[in-house]
Every structure is written in structure tokens, then in C-alpha cells.
Amino acid sequence: MPEVRDWRQLAKTRLEYELLTNELFHLWEFTSLVEYDPLFRNTSNSFKTFLQERGLDVESSLEQDDMKESNASRRLKRRNVISGTADSSSDKNNIWGQVMPLVDQEYSELQEKLRASVCGRRGRKRTQQVASVPAESEEDVAVPRPNKKRQTVVTAQGSAQNKLNTPVVSSPKKSLKQTADKKSKLNKRDSSTNDISVESEDPPVKDITNTGQGKSKARLKSSKAKSKKRAVKSQTELVRKQSPEIKNESKRTKADPTHTNDDGNDNRKTNNKSKNIINNNESGLKTSLNTTGDIIDDEEYYFTSSSEDDDNEKPRTALQKKSLPNRLKVKLHVNAPRQTITNPLHVLKPEYADVHSFLQSYKSLDEDVSLEEYDSYIKEQRKTAKLIRIGFERGAIKYDPQTDSLQSLSLRDVMPPSNAAEPISVYYKEQSKHTFQDHLVNQGIVLSKSFQDSRRSQIAKARRVAQIIESHFKHIAGAEERKLKEEEKRKKNLARFAMQAVKKRWTMAEKAYKVLKKDELDQLERIQGKQHLTEMLEQSTQLLGAQLNQLDSCTYPSEASDASSEFSANEESDGNSDIDDEMMSTSSCDSDKEGNTERIGNDMELSVEELRSKYAQLNKINDFGNETSKSAADESIFDEASDSVSDSMEDSLSSSESETEDADASAQEDTPGLSALLGNIDENEEDVEADVNFDADSSSDDGLDGDSSGAENNSKTEELPSPPKSDNELKDEKAETTESVTSPAAADPLAVSDVPVPSLLRGTLRIYQKQGLNWLASLYNNKTNGILADEMGLGKTIQTISLLAYLACEKENWGPHLIVVPTSVLLNWEMEFKRFAPGFKVLTYYGSPQQRREKRKGWNKPDAFHVCITSYQLVVHDQHSFKRKKWQYMILDEAHNIKNFRSTRWQALLNFNTERRLLLTGTPLQNNLAELWSLLYFLMPQTALENGKVSGFADLDAFQQWFGRPVDKIVETGENYEQDEETKKTVSKLHQVLRPYLLRRLKADVEKQMPGKYEHIIYCRLSKRQRFLYDDFMSRAQTKETLASGNFMSIINCLMQLRKVCNHPDLFEVRPILTSFCIEDSVSKSYCDLNNYVYNRLHENQFETSVDLSNLNFQFTSNDKTLSTNHSEKISELQCVQPILKEISRLKQLNENDSPVTQPDFQDLNQYYSYAKHNKINEIIGQLEHLNYMNNLRCNRRPMYGSNIVKLLTVGPKKFIDCELTQESIKPLETRLLEGKETIEKFAVITPPVVTLDIRERAVGVDDNNKRFEESVKHHLVSQMRSLENPFHQLQTKLSVAFPDKSLLQYDCGKLQKLAQLLQNLKDNGHRALIFTQMTKVLDILEQFLNFHGYLYMRLDGATKIEDRQILTERFNSDPRITVFILSSRSGGLGINLTGADTVIFYDSDWNPAMDKQCQDRCHRIGQTRDVHIYRFVSDHTIESNILKKANQKRHLDNVVIQTGDFTTDYFTKLSVKDLLGAEAPEDIPDDKPLLQDQKNLNKLLAQAEDEDDAKAAKSALREVNVDNEDFQEGSVAAQDGNSDNENNEDSEDEYGGTSHVEEYMVRFIANGFYY
């Protein structure tokens, strides 16, 4: 029978378990029991997790224990189940099902008791005193109110649960122990009365030990407690008997002496075992609730608080000791071996009595410490632990589970908000123990504070009112005085404003006076400048007349004279007055006896005959002594002007810079003007007449026809520095006038004399090079510096070397000379010296700093070297070493790169200690006249005047003012425009100023000595495709918006696209390669599918309606197709059936002999065997009879006609194979293709728009829809077809892919059409051509074009290596079979000399026309023997023609000033969109808006607009040039335009125009000197 269980006691135990776990969870979560509700049954997930993590969950412990049972117990249970003796497993599972309703009932009873106690407490009188707190409790500590509250629920059976928020606890283990200790202390305190109170939060339950009712109730309950104690014991024993788990656990507990049960803390040490939980709960109840020997009544419970002190050292009661299991004591008996004593000293006295005491003497820590240190450390740790515990209780610190650390609370966490209620300052037990007196006193204190605050506020208000009244009366008392002060202050402000206005007015008047004064000074300076210019022209005319007297002492052969005269005649016919001015002497009639401009104008208006009659008396002066003295005086004047180069260069430079930087200065000093060349001119009329006479007698002209051995008194033509005249006037004047040649004895020592060719020079000089040597020698003789500005390719290097050789041979001046050149031509100069003048000691100064230091060692010794060649970069870097050495000649190659006079390089070179200076440049004029002035000032920086003052060559502002505006006017209006007199005079004066210091000869000047150069512009019409693409691009809305936007980058991109269209349409839009559109299925497939579908539907029931001819015997049988009559007869005769018949009869006889068995008996094996044998024989007999029947049937078949008759009467297709028509129609496929090859080549030109992929399979019949062949046959045929070569490959390729015809490459482009004609003419006449283009892709098109026409060509572009260029050029020059050399204008110019070609073709023009100029010089240079023709292709009515028109205007500027041929891309800053597009430009684009305002980023922007290959080629070309540019790069500010200052002056004049009478009075007052 099942044991009888005490369910009531088990329910109480369950209730106690739930109360304890709930309290434990509350303490763990909130660290105190404030607001703790004992009736709250927590079912939250956090509560369940808490129990499971700490092994306090009963259900999970039972499940785990069941899983951990041993195999023996399982076998025992299984045996009990089988035998039926064991109880059903449902008893175990239904324990909690029966207990839980009783637990709910216990909760409801407890709730009723609490409610009744609360109601009785409310009826008590207020006079009852509250029992004081026992002495063992801690002092009152203010505990802050928790921030968060958990809502708990008071649970009753059948009622809802009300939840409260409770504070969180940090240390569950410590709180549990403290709870048990506090229970024991409280039980000890209340042991005399046995009164247990129930605590709750709202309302708090008060202690009733002092009331009589409480005493009587306690006595009644004491007897009940004893009886219930015995009941609890009996019920506990009963539960243990009924529950095998508890019983086993108790046995386990007794067996394990180490298993203790300490104050309920075993709930945390049970390792999730439910049996231990129940056992521990029983022992916990006994030890915690019954410390005095009595059992607590079920009606009331006492719950402890964590705020009470711990008392771990109190002895346990007898009951507690009984409840604890006995401990096993282990005693260790160690029998130590006896000591071997050989000496009395070996006897050791034991320090410890036993091993245990010895082991206890060791105290282990992280470090080895003594016992005293260990004890002190333990005390400190206990003190620290106590402080931590107190901190936890008082809320000063908290535990952070995330970081596993203790954290202190900050003041902000502890202090409540200002508007919040004050926190509870006492514990939850003590906050309800205030008496009425306490409340009364507190209320009195509060009211007292309120009265004091009210009193203070009223006093403050009264004080504030008194202050307001006092201030009011003070304000009334000082009103008069304040009014006087305000009036005085107002008057002062008015006086100050009036004074400031007057001062401002006088300041403006002072500025106006300074401006007017400056205008007067400027006007005076202009007058003085004109005076200085006139005097400078006189000096220039005198110097030039002396230089150009070379024919008086020159003994040229007659051929040279004829060539010179022929050259002069050509110049006269061309009407180039500038070249005539350069080759002829200029009369000094520009400066008359008074030296004024009016006289100059009168002389310029006279004809040559009138001038001759006017100055006829000057030709009669023959006094040689006077001429010698005058020439000596002139020489002394010139020497004095040119030798004083040491004092005032800095003054002049600083003066010019100060004028540029500070344009608004109060006063501007007088500029020296051009007095550098004319300071020592005598103003006496007689001297001037003598000078003019001298010039007239000694002047000479190179360009006239005449024989030196002819008439002695014939004088040469002398052209005045008058404005350019028409061609007819020049011809008439030159034909009518002749002058006599002066004798050599009367030659001026300053004149240019013919010098011998130095013996050190190897090689032969050309005539113009010999004239250049004479000019350079005259500069040295006259102690003058100069600029050799011959065009590139005329041999400036050899002329310079010949000058140095002349100085060494004739003047015995061996240097040292300094030659500064760009880095790229440094070695080239050294090689030229070794080639033409090997007698010089040349020092090439380059290398690392150490190498240069080695080269400088000993260079101060005499004749250490004769010539030093270095680069601009190194000469500036080592300028201190070069400045210490005295140089005879300083020669600067490519001197136009020092055009910036503000740069440190210009100033450093200017200060070198040199006797003479020579500048070599091919492009002396760049963008403005300021750069030309910088070169001239570099030659003559300082000049001495008569009065001892020193001044520079000329002021930059004056130079710009004299020549800048008239020259700009000529460029803007054009060369053919009729110029006014002032402009003509200015240009003539500029020529006169430049002529003494500049020798400039173009290739056209020496065309008799060099092959001619002819430029042709070929205008090409656009093809139809080009015109369509060009117009389409221009008509796009996006293009119009881009051009109207004014964005330079967008406009350049548009221009680049237009240039691509002009060069070739394939650059803009490639002609496509057409292919057929390929689809998978053909049209026939869909038709066949539809046809098959319709056919199948129509013949769906054909077998039902059709007639079978075979059944009607209207068809030949199969015997007639296979058998003949003879075969059928022979088969019937030869059939073999006898063996089969014999075997059949034998088997039948055998079967008849045996008695048949109808029903076999399976019990008899013999009878069953005979039955099976009989059946087997019958089966064989049936098979043999069927075989005999089939044999007879097949052998006895007879055909109706026989196959022999059918074949005889049938006409087959093989009979037509051998006929001639059949042989023609069945030719092989290869034969057909070969025969039709010509047709295929001619007519297979149209690519079908669409092709299909299934035509081949359909033609063969192996497509999917064809049922003619089986699938295996189809696969076999397809594999065989794929392995065969396709005979239609060529035809299919021509029909599927349509490549553009090669001839379209030429006919799509107008330039290539013209080029084809031009190349054909050139090749027929034996010419060779260079074709230049800017774009690399055009070179690819040109390659295709030349390959199409079969020309032999070579190619050189930016990708060609530098070392390969020389190989290509040498091969082209040496191999006449190569007709064309195509080059990129960006391929660089170092080491390229293509004199083997005599034709240059510019397919397109470069952005920078200087590149085109350099490309021309590769062919037209020294070494060329034939005339060079230059063809420039320009697309008509396009952007190219407009760009060329604007570029020619820039070229004309060079012809006006110095006749140079170089210009840069700065014309983009001058052009507008309408200038480039012409009539095709949109109407809404402004006319005068330039493309680009700033030129700094022009090259970068152009590179971005070009293709990547072209940009790379340009970059590589610039990288080569960059070696030279690094020598000339300077971070200084560029020279300012001269026009800017003049514009500022005009603006300043307009600013002060139109003054009132007051302002006029003020200005007069200042002017009279009364202001200062």
C-alpha cells in the first residue's frame, strides 16, 4: 500500500521555500527589504533565471536527479514495474499537483491574518508608545530613496496580483547570511515574550509587545507552538518516508560528514539538487525560526532586514547543533623514522608538537610574509570587508555585474533633485516610530523657517522701495547740472564732427593738389622724354653710321657684291623698308641744329633731291684733321657713355620698380629718360652740323648696285629714317639717287671694318656669317655690347666661336670668356668648339657639387682655361664663385629667357664682372616691349652723363610710353592700313634705337646664300560626311549652350571636336563595321512548324477513312520483293523436317508407355517425380510440333510474280546517272565555288541585315523538326559536318561582316584628297616630304593612307625614344627611296635634322604656332641645298581658317618691330568665341569676351582637352624642354604692362575732374604754400 503523506506539512514547507526564495531574490535585487511584500508570489522570468543559476529551482533539480540516477536503480525500478510491486510513476509526478492547491490556501490564510492585524492596529489609540529599537541594532543612517520601484502583487486565491517595484540588490550571498543572523538576534531579543510580529510596508506593522492584548495572545500561542513543533517533526519524518529522494538524501547527508547545513546558506551550495533544498529548508526553518526551542506560529512571520549588524561569532544553540550533521574527524598519525645520531649536535629538538601545528604555522599569501605581517594584513582585510559591507547597507557603493567591480556613488546620484521630496533618512522600521510630539516639533520648525523667510523678504522689499525713492529725489536734485553737462557734451561732439569734416575736406584737397602736381610732373617728363628721345636718335644715327661704313674698307669679290646688290634689289622690289633700314646707313638729319622735333619733321617731308641740295655744302669738307678730331671726340663720347657701367644700375632698377609698385605715391621723381645715349652730346649748332656732315660723308649702304672700281665720286643711296613708303616711291627714289663712296683713308675708327678670318677657326664662313663676325668685331672695337638675333638655323654658334678666335688671334685676348647656355645644348657647344676651334682650352662646368668644386681648383691661374661653358642653373647656383672672377666676354645663349628683369637670375647675371656682353637669341620679341627693354638694359645698364650723374639705358615706363601704344595700334589695324604720321615716326624711331645694338637677319635676308623657303596655304573643302558631322555638331543645343557659357574648358573641348572633324571624320565618329543581326530560328522554321501542325490536323483521322491497298491485294507482297520463283521451289525441296518428326513420335511413344498420373500425391516422392516428367515431355512435344509448323509455312511460301519478274519490269534512277546532263548537274561543291569565285568577289558586297543559325541544319535535314532521320543518325551527321571544312567561309564572311572600303579613308576627308594629289606630284618630281600633325591618331590614319597608296614612309612620334630619333633621321637623310616622313609636332626637337626633305606639309596646325615654326626649321636650316616649300592644310570655312587669321595678326607684330617669327598660345587670351567660329557662332555670344583671362593654366587646360596619347606626347616633349626651362624658371612676378600705369593715370585724372570754387580755393591755398 502506498504510504500516507502529510500534504499539509509539505505545503507549509513549500510555502516556507517560496517565502525564503522570494526574500532572497528581493535582497539580491534591492539590497534591503524596504517595500518587500511577503505575499507576493514572483513568477517573472528573472526570478526563474535567478533560481536556476543558483540551483534553487525544485523542478529542474528533480529532473536532473532523475537523469543522474545509476543504472542499478533504473534496473530496480524496471523490475518493480514488471513485478507490479512498485508504485506507479504518476505518484511522483503528482506530488506537486496535490501540494500546490494547499500552498495557495496557505497564502490566502496568511493574507487574511495580515489584513485582520492591520485592521486591529488601526483601532488602537494614538497614546500607545512605540517600543524603542534594541541596542543591538545599528545607528540610524539616512538611506536614499531608490530611484526605481518594482510593482509587487499581493496574491490571494482567486484574486488578481498587485505588483510593486522593489530596489535592486547587489550581493545575494552576503544578504542571505545577514538575514539568518538578524533572525537569530531578533528571536533572542523577543524570546521572553515569544511575540513574533509581521512587517509590511503600507501601513507599517508596529510591535505589540507592550500591549496587554499582545501578552495574552502570546501566552495562548506558546502552547500551540509546542504541539505544532511535535507535529512538524512527525510530518517531516513522514515526508522522508514517503519520498525516496528525501530519504536517500538524508542517508547521503549522514554518510558525508563534510555536508553541513549552515543557516540556510545551503540553498546556494546544493548544485541544483531538489533533495538538498527540502532538507536544507527544514533545517533552515528549525535554526532560524526556532532558536529558543519554540515553533513559530503559522499565523505570523518575522522578516529580517539587511540593515542589521552581522553576528558571526555568536555560539550556536543546542537545537542548531543538533540539526547539523556530525562531522568526521580525520587524525593523521605520522611515524617519523628515527634519527641517526653520530654527534650530539645532531640531536634536534622539535619546534612543533605535531604536523598539524607545523602546517598551521605557514600562512600563504602572494608574497612570503611573517606571522605578524599576516595577522595585520588579515585585520586590514577584515576592516576593509566590513567597510564594504557597511557601504552596501548604506547605499554608498554598488556592484556592477558588467565590469565585475565595485563602484562608488557620486554626489549627483545620492543627492535628490531640487524639486523632489526629501529622501527617507531612517530605515523602514524607524520611519514609522515618530510620535505626535515629533510631528508637532517638526511642524513648528517648518513654520518658524517660513516666518523667517517671509520676514526677510519683506525687509528686502522695504529696502528696495527706500532705494528707489532716494534715487528719485537725487535725480530731481541734479537735473540742472546734468542738463548743462549734456549740452556741453553735445557742443563738443558738434565741434569734433565739424573738425573732422574740415580735415577730411582739406585732406581731399591735398590729394587733389598732389594729383595735379603729379600730372604737371608727368607732362614735364613727357616733354623731357621727347627731348631725350630726339637726342638718343641722334646718337643712334651717329653710331649706326659709323658701324655701317664697312664697304669703304671691305674688299669683297665681285660675286659677293653682285649677290649683295641682287639681294638689295629683291628687297626693294618686295618693299620691305625694315630690311633696307637694317642694311643701310641712316642719315642724321633727324637731329637738326636746334635739336627740336619740328626740324625733324621738315627734313622727313623733303625728297632725296631736296635733301641733297640742302646739305650740299657738307660734302665739301675735306679737312682730314678736323674729321680726325671730330671722330676722336665722338669716340671719346661713346667710350665715356659705354664704359661707365659700375655705379648707378641699382638706382635705376630700384627707381623703375618703385614706380611699378607704388603708383599712388605723393610725388614721383624725375626719370632720367633716354639720356644714357645722349648725355654728352654737344648742343652747339656748329658741332651738330659737323656731326651731320661726318655722318653724311661716312655713311654707306650694302644694298646698291655698283662697282667699287668704277667712278670714284659715285655716292651710295642713303635712306632716311622716314616712315615706310610705297613700292613705287621707293623704286623711283632709289633709281634716281646715288652718292659717292668715301675713301678708306677717311673711314671712321668706329666704323665696321672687314676683319680677317682668324687662323684658329677651322672651316669656311658663309658671307652673312662673315658679315656677322665683322659686326661683332666692331662691337668689341667700339666697346659696345650687342644682341645677335639671327633667325634659328643661321649659325649663331659658329659666329660666336669665330669672334672669340678673332680676339685671340688679332687682339691677343684669350679670355677667359664665360658662355651660359641651356642645359640641353651644353655638350653641343663643347662639340662645336672641338670641331671649329680646337685650339681653345674649354672648361665644361657641370656635374655634382663635388665635381664642380674640383673643376674650380686652380682656375684663377693664368691660362687655366680660355672658355668656360656652363648652364643657367649652375651659374646662378655658384654665382659667388663666378662673380669673383673677371671675365672678358659673357655670352648668353637663348637670352630671351632672361626677359624678366625682376628675377634673381637677371639681377645675378647683371652684376657679373665682365668687360663685354653678347646676347644670342632667335626670338628677341616675345609678348610685349618690356621684355625687349630688359634685354637692352642688360647690355647697357649704366651710362655716365656730362654732369657726373649716372643713369640707366632708359626707363621702362618711358620706353613703353614711347613705343608701346603705336606698335599695338599697328598690330590691331593691320599692315595694309594707312598709318598716321605719329605712328610712322614712332616706328621709325624704334628701328633707329634698336639698330645699333641688334643684328637681326632672317633666312629671307640671306636667301641667296641659303635655299629659299616658300609657304603655301592649301584650303581644303570638307567632304559630304565631314560637312554633315560639322553642321550637326554646331547645331546641337548642348554645343550652343557650351559656347554661350564662356567656360574655357568646355569651349576648348568643343573646338577640339571640331578640329577632329576637320582632320578626319573617323576621329570624331568611326565608320562602323557592319554585321548581320543573328537570330536563332529562320522564317522557314516557323512556316514549317505551322505547316506540319496544319497537316497533322488535317490527316488526324486518315487511317479511319483511307483504304488499305494491301488488304485488297493491290500491292506487291513482301514475297514478291524478296523471293523469286526459283528460290521458293528450291527452299521447299531442301527443307529438313524428318528429324523433328522422328523426335516427336519418339516422345509420344515414351509418354504412352508410362501410366499417366492425374492427381499426384506429394507424400510419395516417386509418384510426384513421374508426374513432373510426364508434363515435361508433353511440353517438349508441343514446342517441336510448333517448330515443324512454322518451318513448313516458311518453306512453302510462293510469290505471286517473283522478284526476278518485278526487277525486270522496274525502271530505276541509276539508269540516268551516266548521262551528260546528270554529270553537269552533280558537280562537287568545291568545283562550283571555284567556278563562281569571280561572281562571289564582284557581287557579294551587300551584307544581309539578318541571318539565321538553323539554315545549315535545315538544308541538310538534321533539324529538330525533321523526322526523316533518326536521332542517332542526326547526331552522327552533325558531328561529321562540324569536322569538315566550311567551303562557304569566304562567302559567309563577306556577307556577314562588311568592313569599310579602304578608299573611303581618302574620300571621307578633304585634306586626304588634297594630300593624295600633292604627294603624287612630289614623287613624280623627285621631292621628299615631311608631314607634321598634332594628333597621334592622325598619324595612324596617315599610315593607313600611305599603305593604301604604296608609299615608303617612316614614322616618329612622342613614343619614339630619344636614342632612336637620330637613327631614324640619319636613315631618312641617307635613303632617297623613302618618300614621306610622318612626324608629330610634339615629338621634340633635340637632335632632329631632316635636311633630306625639301617639302614640309602641316596636316593641321598646333595650338602653339611656335611648334610649327620649330618643325619648319628641321628642314630649312644649314645643310639644305634645295628650296623648301611649306604647305599648310586648312579646312575652308571652319575653325581652322579663323585661328589662322588671328595667328597671322600676331605674326605681323614681329614684322613691325624686329621681324621675328615666334609667338605663343597667348592669343587665346585675346580671342573670343566669335573670332574662332566666325559667322557660325551663335548670336547670343558676346563679341568681346575672351576665351581665357589668365594664361597660367593654359597648357594644362589644353592638355585636358586633347586625347590621352597626345597629352602624353606633349608631356614628354615638355619634359625634354623642361631641362632648359628649369634654368629659366623664376618665382618672381612678371613685368607689368605699360598700359596699366597709363590707365591708372587716366582714372586718377577722371576722379578729380570738375571741382567747385571752394575746392579750387583750397587747392590754390595749398599751391601757394600756406597749407604746409
Curated annotation (Swiss-Prot):
A motif (DEAH box) lies at residues 893-896. It catalyses: ATP + H2O = ADP + phosphate + H(+). ATP binds at residues 790-797. Residues 216-232 have a biased composition (Basic residues). Residues 82-94, 152-173, 282-291 have a biased composition (Polar residues). Residues 558-568, 643-657 have a biased composition (Low complexity). One of its GO terms (cellular component) is Swr1 complex. Keywords: Activator, ATP-binding, Chromatin regulator, DNA-binding, Helicase, Hydrolase, Nucleotide-binding, Nucleus, Transcription, Transcription regulation. Residues 777-942 form the Helicase ATP-binding domain. One of its GO terms (molecular function) is histone binding. Residues 1314-1464 form the Helicase C-terminal domain. GO terms for biological process: chromatin remodeling. It is an enzyme of class 3 (hydrolase). Residues 179-192, 238-269, 590-602, 726-737, 1511-1522 have a biased composition (Basic and acidic residues). Its EC number is 3.6.4.12. Residues 424-496 form the HSA domain. It is found in: Nucleus. Pfam families: Helicase_C (PF00271), HSA (PF07529), SNF2-rel_dom (PF00176). Signal peptide: none annotated. Residues 61-94, 119-291, 304-323, 555-604, 624-675, 694-749, 1505-1556 are annotated as: Disordered. Residues 569-583, 694-705, 1543-1552 have a biased composition (Acidic residues). Catalytic component of the SWR1 complex which mediates the ATP-dependent exchange of histone H2A for the H2A variant HZT1 leading to transcriptional regulation of selected genes by chromatin remodeling. Belongs to the SNF2/RAD54 helicase family. SWR1 subfamily. Component of the SWR1 chromatin-remodeling complex. This is Helicase SWR1. The lineage of its organism: Eukaryota, Fungi, Dikarya, Ascomycota, Saccharomycotina. The gene is SWR1.
